[in-house]
Every structure is written in C-alpha cells, then in structure tokens.
Amino acid sequence: MAPGPFSSGLFSPPPAALPFLLLLWAGASRGQPCPGRCICQNVAPTLTMLCAKTGLLFVPPAIDRRVVELRLTDNFIAAVRRRDFANMTSLVHLTLSRNTIGQVAAGAFADLRALRALHLDSNRLAEVRGDQLRGLGNLRHLILGNNQIRKVESAAFDAFLSTVEDLDLSYNNLEALPWEAVGQMVNLNTLTLDHNLIDHIAEGTFVQLHKLVRLDMTSNRLHKLPPDGLFLRSQGGGPKPPTPLTVSFGGNPLHCNCELLWLRRLTREDDLETCATPEHLTDRYFWSIPEEEFLCEPPLITRQAGGRALVVEGQAVSLRCRAVGDPEPVVHWVAPDGRLLGNSSRTRVRGDGTLDVTITTLRDSGTFTCIASNAAGEATAPVEVCVVPLPLMAPPPAAPPPLTEPGSSDIATPGRPGANDSTSERRLVAAELTSSSVLIRWPAQRPVPGIRMYQVQYNSSADDSLVYRMIPSTSQTFLVNDLAAGRAYDLCVLAVYDDGATALPATRVVGCVQFTTAGDPAPCRPLRAHFLGGTMIIAIGGVIVASVLVFIVLLMIRYKVYGDGDSRRIKGTSRTPPRVSHVCSQTNGAGAQQASAPPAPDRYEALREVAVPAAIEAKAMEAEATSTELEVVLGRSLGGSATSLCLLPSEETSGEESRAMTGPRRSRSGALGPPTSAPPTLALVPGGAPARPRPQQRYSFDGDYGALFQSHSYPRRARRTKRHRSTPHLDGAGGGAAGEDGDLGLGSARARLAFTSTEWMLESTV
C-alpha cells in the first residue's frame, strides 16, 4: 500500500542521514554549555570554540576542558592565569592574538602537553621568562610577534628545542637573542626576527640548522654577518640539489668591506639590500657593487705613550695605544718577557687599548709592545718602561762579608742552603712552648744588608702544607698561634733583602728549628665562668635558706620554752596570774559576754582566804547588797553607765570551784543577784584609794570590740586599773579598810593577793 499524503513517512529523515544526526545529538548532549556570545562546534572527534570580538576581559572559566581548538582573538584579556588552561590535555591549537596580555603566569601552559600551535602575537608582553612556556613539549609553532619584548631568557625555549618548526619574534625591541638555544633548534624551518634592534649574530649559530628555509633579519642594526655554512648550501654542487633558502637582511646598516665579501660572492636574485658604510658605497645596492670595492684598511696606530716611561717602583703606570682601521682593530699588549698580557690582579687592558699596571716591580723594566690587528693586517708599537728602584734606608757596607748564594724561599724545597746548618739552627730559639703556641726568637742579622722583611714558614709533621707569615724587618720575635696539640713542627725564618748584584729581592735563611707542642690537657676542664657564677649563686642561696630555717627553729624553741615556763609558773607559784578562761562584761543591762584574752605578764599580789568565819561571811554579803544599791544609784547618775565585776577562776581551781566562784550577775533591771557561795579567790584592783574613772579610755562591748580585745589584749599594771566607786564593799567585806599598802582586813586572816589585768576587768561605758 502506497503511503498517503499525510503518512508519517513524509516527516521521517532519510536513512542515510540518520547516523550523522544521532552523532550530532550525542555530542551535543555530552558537551558542556557554550559560553555566552561564543561559537562552539562539537563535531566528533573535534571540539572547536570561537570567542572572537566578544569583549572578554579574562579567559572564560566555563570552557569545556576537552576542547581541541580554542580561539580567543580580538578581546581585552590582560593576563593569563595558571588555572585558565588547566587540565586541557586535548588542546592542540590556542590563539590569543590581538589582546592586551601583559602577564603570563609561571606554568600557565604546563598542562597543554598536546599543544602544537601557540599564537600570542599583537599583545603587550615585555619579556619571555624560562617558566612561562614550561610544559610545551610538543610545540611546533610559536608566534610572539608584534609585542614589546626586550629580553628572552636562555631557558625560555628549553621545553621545545627539538620540536619547534616556526619561531616568530618580529616587531619587538630585542637587542640580543639566546643564540646558543637557537642553534639547537634542529627542526627549525622559519626564523623571523625582522624589525628588532639586533646588532650582532654569534658566529656558528646556524651550523646545525639544516632544515632552515627562511631567515628574515630585515630592519635590524646588523653591520655584518658572520660567515656560515648555512649560506653556502645553495652554492654547493653535486647530484643532490641544495635546499632552497631565503635570507632577508634588508634595512640593516651594512658595512660593505672585505668581511662581507663572502656574502657578495653568493648568487642571489630580487634582493634589494643596500650599503650604509663606507661613504663611497652609501645607498648602493649590495649585489650591484663589484667585489673589488669590498676593501679593508689595515690598522694604523695613531696615539701611543711616549718612547720612554719612568716610574718609581711600586707606583702605577698607564700605557696608551690607539689604532684606526677598517674594520676596527683590536689592541693587545706583550710584556718585556714575551707574555701576552690580560686582565689580572696587577694589569688591566681597557676597551680603548690602554694598559694599566697598578703596581710596578723591577721586573717590569723593559719594552712593552702594542699590537693592533684586524682582517687586513696588524700594526705594532714599542713602549719602553724604566722602573726606578726604591732608595735604601741605610747605605750598604763598602766590603760586605762573603755570603752564600741566596736560598730558596720555600721550606719544602729540598737541599735548601743553610737549612741543616747547625749554626743557623742555633740562631733560632723556640721559647714558651705550649700546646697551641710558641714564641720564636732570633738575633739581629747584621751581615745581611737592606732587609725588607722577615718571612716565617712552618708546617706540621701530619700536614705537608706550608703556612707563611710576613713580619716587619724590625722584629726579632714572633708568636705562632693556632698550633695543634701534640704535633711536631718544622719552622724556618727567612730574611727578604735587596740583592745588589741583580737588583731583585732575594731571601736568606736566618735559621730553622724543630719543636713539638704539648699534649692535650686533662679531659676534666675547669668550669666556665658562667657555670661557676651559677654555682656560686646556688651556694649563697642555700646558705641564706639554711640561715632562715635555723632562725625559725630557734624562734619556735624559744617560744616553746617560754610558754612552758609561763605555764609552770602559773601552776606552781602565785606570782604569775592564771590564764583567763572567761571575761564577763555587761553594758547597759545587756547579757553577759564571754571572750578569751591572753595572759598578762604583770605581777600582782593575791589574797587567798584561809578561814572565813560565818559572821564575817554574813557581813560581806550585807556589804555586797549595800554596794549594789550604791552602784545602781551611781549608774543612773552617770547617764546609764554601768560597771560590772567578774570573778574569774584560776587554773588551779576545779570545776566545782569555778562554778562556786561565779560572781553575782546583774539582771536586766541592773540589780546584782546574790552569790551562790563565797569565792575562794577575789580579783580586785590593787591599791586602797579609789580612783576616778577616765572616760577617755572607756571601751564598749556593744559592737564587735570583743574580738579587738581578744587579739590586742596587752597586759597592764594593776595600778593603772581604775577602781570604780561601786566596789567599796570589797574593802569592808572583812570588817577592815584597805590601807595604803594595799592590805585588806578580813578578820583574823590577812593575805597578799596578786592581781592581773585578766582576772579583774573593769568596763565603763558612756
């Protein structure tokens, strides 16, 4: 059945085009998106990307890394970064022409192992460094024309010396090239160096360039071309025709003389090179000038030093020699002994042909020869130099004694005269010998006239190298330092003097000596100064610490001894007051407070009760009641000031006695309660006369002054304690009154009481 007009076969592609369309669809589906305003052609197996005149400021980062050909021409890319072409191992052709590239990062093309053509022309490159083109091992075409390149490093082309075929460095500012690297480009076909500032080509540069077919040196500053077998290939005969070679060197200021005669003899056509010099050949076509006119002029010396130059020994002298010729001659100098002079520590030849001798010697006396040479010949001119010797300080003796021949100045020379002479050896003395130094002495050398200096030579038995020391002629001793310990040394002293017969410096052996240095010192060496200082500091610190510890121990022992003595004194005698265990005070009707106070060292007299009759005890209680009422009245009259008496037990009393000794306590109303029993020990203020209270010394326990009294309770004499007017009942408790001597009448029993400030405490608060 034939297909209808609307059959699906009308919309299906032809069978022959189906594989091609599938291939295009597969390539498009696998490829990355094309950068904006760029044209991408993904025709397998080639991926081409064209981004010309798109205004790019840098290399787009979205470029497919599988691209084979990339053209980024006519943009504004200013720099090539390291990451711009990273991992583009399939890139074969890269064009960056007509941009503003001024910087190329090191290793920017390191991943382009398959790159064959690199176009960087019409940019702003100023130099080509050795690390910029690294990694281009398969490069065939390198186009760097129309830049601002002034310098090309010698290692810039090392990566592709054996593979490059086309090198273009035209329209730059090059004054020189690494000609040695260019000579190793064995596969080079085209070398374009036109419109630069090159003025010299190294001889033998093109010897190995057998495949070179085009050399363009147009518009440079070349004056001549070195003869090279490269230019003679087209003239060689034989069954094999020569390789065609095109050499262009027009626009150079060629100097047409005999040095370019080899080039004139070549058969060339349609070349319009002209001559710039000499004057009679200016602006004439190079190939139209007859060979007879390519002439050279031999050198002519136009200026030289006078026929004779006088100079004092040791001073400098300059010998001038100028020559003219075509080509410009080169000047050399020859010494009086026939040596060709060059630049050394004593002589220097300038570029204009002047010879400078910085230090003249007597051997410089004679005729120096100036030689000027070029391709046409050479010219010579002699210059005589007369060196005047230095005058001697003392005139030589009229008849000097006969001397042996001057010996060698080297101690290592065998058979030196006087070296083994016993007389000379006795003249030299080695004194003050140590492991690293020795002092050498020798007598004055009167028979030798005009001694300039002494030379000391010595070497070790384990080392054949000589050590030289030059010392003044006035010295007769020399200290040799830096010697090795335990070694044998040979030492000789030589006198350097003026030989009157030859007018040259001569040497004579003064004497020789052999000695052996002392052995190594003991392995235990004294401590160095800084170590010794540290040890002294540690020792002094230890002494100080030990002294402090001893002082502390003594203080502790003393404190313990005195503490034990005080306790024994308290327990055994009545001269030391007992330690206070409680302090009872009352202020303005407040409750009793207790505080501990340190014992006072003051001595008081204590009155102990031996036997108290019942009648006396009743009278004492009656007197207490009377005094209590009087105290209440006085307290009210003083504006609320109150006084309290506390009976403090001593350490000798037992617990029951302490409870029995507790004195009457004052109630909230200010009345004293009756005592439970008579106290065996009473703490009273010494002295019979009552004392007026001192308001300026009153203290109050209302605040936190209890702690103050505890930490700062200093002992006070009983006579400084003020008696309160509320205590007269203590004076009459025994039926008697206190006398001037402090005795109290207690019936038939009288005793002496010792009072302490801690056993009787009086407080008065206003």
Curated annotation (Swiss-Prot):
Extracellular topological domain residue ranges: 32-536
Composition-biased stretches (Basic residues): 714-727
Classification via PROSITE patterns: FN3, IG_LIKE, LRR
GO biological process assignments: regulation of postsynaptic density assembly
Residue intervals annotated with topology Cytoplasmic: 558-766
Motif, PDZ-binding: chain positions: 763-766
Membrane-related topology note: Single-pass type I membrane protein
Signal peptide from the UniProt entry: 1-31
Residues annotated as domain LRRNT: 32-65
Gene3D superfamilies for the chain: Immunoglobulins, Ribonuclease Inhibitor
Cited InterPro entries: Cys-rich_flank_reg_C, FN3_dom, FN3_sf, Ig-like_dom, Ig-like_dom_sf, Ig-like_fold, Ig_I-set, Ig_sub
Domain Ig-like intervals: 299-386
GO cellular component: cell surface; postsynaptic density membrane
Residues with attached carbohydrate: N87, N343
Phosphoserine: modified positions: S713
PTM annotation: Glycosylated.
Location, primary (coarse class): membrane
Membrane-spanning intervals of the chain: 537-557
Disulfide bonds: C321-C370
Family: Belongs to the LRFN family.
Role: Promotes neurite outgrowth in hippocampal neurons. Involved in the regulation and maintenance of excitatory synapses. Induces the clustering of excitatory postsynaptic proteins, including DLG4, DLGAP1, GRIA1 and GRIN1.
Subunit structure: Can form heteromeric complexes with LRFN2, LRFN3, LRFN4 and LRFN5. Forms homomeric complexes, but not across cell junctions. Interacts with DLG4. Also interacts with DLG1, DLG2, and DLG3. Interacts with 2 AMPA receptor subunits GRIA1 and GRIA2 and NMDA receptor subunit GRIN1.
UniProt name for this protein: Leucine-rich repeat and fibronectin type III domain-containing protein 1
The organism of origin for this protein: Mus musculus (Mouse)
Gene name as annotated: Lrfn1
